[in-house]
Amino acid sequence: MDRSDSEKTDVLPMFKQEYGRYGRQMLVPEFGISGQLDLRSKRILVVGAGGLGSPAIQYLAGAGIGHITIIDDDTVEESNLHRQTIHAGNVNVPKSESAAEFVGKLNPCISVTPMVVRLSPSNSFSVFEGHDLVLDCTDGPAVRYLINDTAVLSGIPVVSASALKTEGQLSIYNYNGGPCYRCLFPIPPPADAVQTCGDGGIMGPVVGMMGMSQAMEAIKLLTGVYSESFTPFLMLYSAYNFPPWKSVKVRKRQKTCAACGDVPRISRQLIETGQVDYSEFCGSPSQVLLGEEHRITPEEYSKIVSTKHILLDVRERPQFDITSFPRSINIPWSELKHKEELDVQVDGSPVYVVCRYGNDSQNAVDKLQKLGIPSKDIKGGLYAWAKNVDEKFPIY
């Protein structure tokens, strides 16, 4: 930004260009120039530059946050672009660098730092240092607990959101004596019950709404809207409900909380030395459940695909409708797991099972074997088939 003819003075606390850039929001009585000056002096850390981080970063940058740090070790994929519009034209570019590039073009009045690393127990405290607020734009329980614990011990509030399919939720943690994430969720959900956008799907506008809401709540926090009175809440959004928005009160800070309680059991030393094992705490479903004798590679299956056999596709129906093998039979794993017998005549034919990535298909083979039906899992599922056998097969 060329400020040679627009330097700040005692009369003008901002550069002339900033008055023109932020004028419309400074006209809002609840915000004003005092709010703009507040934002101008603040530093925000955004963890995750994906579906939530993409809109949040765009609107925070536009609003004039003084500095934004973006940490994400992932790269942009084509499947991201329907909802992560900040990355347009940047497939295969690190997300944090792509987002920082967008910020630099959108608002040269602020500064931005991209970090192409994964947030971990060994670096979280150094990453958080010097920031006024953290936006949790991640999609996994383990990293959410890490963000929470680091924020509590660093004295930094967190604006956290999530989105899946057509629904989203948002809350503020560790602010003004309110609860932290562990207060509300002391025990993580079962690992097998956790879905990501890649598993369950996501509507772009839904995650966009949640990311923009994070940006708005961040602005309110940083400009003192909640400073006098703050009632902890959980904001819920459901795109196909009417009305789509509702807000509910949540429990207060828990005195017995492991992170922010009266006698906390989590410390910086325990985190940095790996004694708080977030992966173990949250669990992780095993990726290999079956012995090799019960599995077959996509290449091996390609040699028998034209022979007589039964192919069960255990994906959910919407995924099956997107693409499938000819003559495959769809029995979703969510249904098969409860069956006491198979609704398909096997008649001695070999049975093979496929899913999207080769996880549910292993569970299905294990179930079929318990029902007395010999079967084999196709390793890596349809994704591996498209990658290793048929490049024309659509992946999603």
Curated annotation (Swiss-Prot):
CDD domains found in the cross-reference section = ThiF_MoeB_HesA_family
Q: In which pathway does it act?
A: tRNA modification; 5-methoxycarbonylmethyl-2-thiouridine-tRNA biosynthesis
Kindly give the Pfam families that the UniProt entry links to this protein: Rhodanese (PF00581), ThiF (PF00899)
Keyword set, alphabetical order: ATP-binding, Cytoplasm, Metal-binding, Multifunctional enzyme, Nucleotide-binding, Nucleotidyltransferase, Transferase, tRNA processing, Ubl conjugation pathway, Zinc
| Predominant cellular place of this UniProt entry's protein | cytoplasm
Q: Which domain of life is it from?
A: Eukaryota
Instruction: Provide one Gene Ontology cellular component.
Output: cytoplasm
Which residues hold ATP? 51, 72, 79-83, 95, 139-140
Tell me which residues this entry annotates as catalytic: 197 (glycyl thioester intermediate), 355 (cysteine persulfide intermediate)
Q: What class of enzyme is it?
A: transferase
Extract one GO BP annotation from the record. tRNA wobble position uridine thiolation
- What's the EC number here? 2.7.7.-, 2.8.1.-
Query: What are the names of the required cofactors?
Result: Zn(2+)
An example Gene Ontology molecular-function term: nucleotidyltransferase activity
Q: Where in the cell is it found?
A: Cytoplasm, Cytosol
Extract the SUPFAM superfamilies matched here: Activating enzymes of the ubiquitin-like proteins
Which amino acids does the record list as binding Zn(2+)? 180, 183, 257, 260
Cofactor binding description = Binds 1 zinc ion per subunit.
Which stretches make up the Rhodanese domain? 305-394
Q: What InterPro entries is this protein classified in? A: MOCS3/Uba4 (IPR028885), Rhodanese-like_dom (IPR001763), Rhodanese-like_dom_sf (IPR036873), ThiF/MoeB/HesA (IPR045886), ThiF_NAD_FAD-bd (IPR000594), Ubiquitin-activating_enz (IPR035985)
What does the sequence similarity comment in the record state about its family?
In the N-terminal section; belongs to the HesA/MoeB/ThiF family. UBA4 subfamily.
* PANTHER family, per the entry: ADENYLYLTRANSFERASE AND SULFURTRANSFERASE MOCS3, UBIQUITIN-ACTIVATING ENZYME E1
The free-text function statement in the UniProt record for this protein reads:
Plays a central role in 2-thiolation of mcm(5)S(2)U at tRNA wobble positions of cytosolic tRNA(Lys), tRNA(Glu) and tRNA(Gln). Acts by mediating the C-terminal thiocarboxylation of sulfur carrier URM1. Its N-terminus first activates URM1 as acyl-adenylate (-COAMP), then the persulfide sulfur on the catalytic cysteine is transferred to URM1 to form thiocarboxylation (-COSH) of its C-terminus. The reaction probably involves hydrogen sulfide that is generated from the persulfide intermediate and that acts as a nucleophile towards URM1. Subsequently, a transient disulfide bond is formed.
| Protein's name in the database | Adenylyltransferase and sulfurtransferase UBA4
